[in-house]
Every structure is written in structure tokens, then in C-alpha cells.
Amino acid sequence: IVFTNGVFDLLHPGHVRYLQRARSLGDLLIVGLNADASVRRNKGPDRPITAEHERAELLAALECVDAVVIFEQDTPAEIVRLIQPDILVKGADWPADQIVGRDTVEARGGRVVLVPVEPGHSTSSILGRIRRQT
């Protein structure tokens, strides 16, 4: 089981390529998705742009995603404990000591894999371009 998590607001090619790489590491990819309230607490009151049920629907439609789990907490720690993935995937822009669930996964012999981030693809940059054009 491979697990990753995120907001995945305004799904873009960088997200898709990241998830494809994550899926290539195992037989099953489960994506933890921050609920709307969690996103607001983590990213501010103007986020997410796309509602959680729509973000979940888009993710679930991807061939590389086997399951989507929406979580209300600020971090996926509880879901990682429940799922017990063999591989935890995060973007390479995450400092190793800040990866939530790392201890849980490594304690049972699993591993954390950092996947390179696609340059030029981020929801923040998309939102910035939209704001500059309006």
C-alpha cells in the first residue's frame, strides 16, 4: 500500500504526475485529502477553491488513484496509523523531519519516498496568475 496526502486544489499536471509516480511504487495508491475545514485552517479562509467532494471526485477519476480518503484533521497522522502503508510518499520540497506519519511507517519497516516536485506547476502559482489577470 502506497499513501500520500494533500489538498489537491485546482488539480493540475504536476499533481497528476506526482500521483502517477506515487502509484508506480506499489500495487495500491490511497490518497488522503484534506477536508475543506482543514484546508482553511492550513491555507487561509480563501481556500480551497474547489470543494472537497469535487476534489475527491477528480482524484478518484485518475487511473493511478485506487482510493481517496477525506480527513478533517490538520494532518494525516491518524489515517496513516489506520492504513499502515508500506510506502509514504511526499513531495521532495518537504523537509524529512516534518513528514507526518514518517515514524509510524518506518516503525513497521516501511519507507518514506520523496518525489520530485514539477517545476512551474503549483496551485499557488495558478492562483497568482489568475489574480494578476483580474
Predicted regions: what is each one?
Residues 1-134:
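Nucleotidyltransferase catalytic core that binds NTPs
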